[in-house]
Design a protein with these regions (language model features):
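Positively charged, small/polar-rich N-terminal and surface patches that mediate targeting and assembly
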Residues: 24-25, 73, 95, 112
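N-terminal small/glycine-rich loop or linker at the start of catalytic domains
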Residues: 25-52, 115-138
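Glycine-rich tight-turn/loop motif centered on a GG-T
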Residues: 2-5, 45-54, 83-98, 126-144
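N-terminal amphipathic/basic leader segments beginning at the initiator methionine
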Residues: 1-21
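Active-site cofactor/substrate anionic-group-binding motifs, chiefly glycine-
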Residues: 42-74, 78, 90-93, 98-102
Length: 150
């Protein structure tokens, strides 16, 4: 079949476009990043991310309340621990910054969906994503550590 004119009936008006679209994006489809700093009280702007803040454990629920008010129903938490070491042990500390943030959020907002970042770069004193062996990340040792995080 050779078409000299492409049919555009599904694009002819706003109503039909809304009815036939394949993708819908709404606030409840979004995941909001929340940066939680164990050493912080209150919240502090992140210069490199305009409009974003680091929250202390005392204000993490405020961030979630703002999400819910905007229709966002989930977040991903990024932790900034007080203690950093070569293997990132604060990442699996039962009283770590993310573990405490999850408890606070779930106590107030049990239906709010919380995702956590399991990268260990923020927890290591060298900034790499796992335990080092010489100048390289030791993947096997790091995988063992990661099992402790989740």
């Amino acid at each position: 079949m050779e078409l000299t004119q492409r049919p555009r009936r599904l694009r002819s008006g706003d109503t039909i476009r809304r009815m036939c679209r394949e993708t819908r994006l709404s606030a409840d489809s979004l995941i909001y990043p929340i940066f939680v700093d164990e050493t912080l009280s209150g919240k502090r702007p992140i210069d490199s991310l305009p409009g974003q803040f680091q929250y202390g454990l005392d204000t993490v629920e405020e961030a979630v309340a703002e999400c819910i008010a905007a229709g966002v129903r989930s977040c991903i938490l990024f932790g900034i621990p007080a203690h950093k070491d070569a293997v990132g042990s604060s990442a699996w500390d039962a009283n770590g910054v993310i573990q405490n943030a999850i408890r606070k959020i779930k106590a107030t907002y049990p239906d709010f969906y919380v995702i956590t970042d399991v990268c260990m770069c923020e927890y290591t004193d060298h900034g790499h994503c796992g335990a080092l062996c010489g100048h390289d990340v030791d993947n096997d040792a790091t995988l063992e550590d990661r099992k402790s995080v989740v």
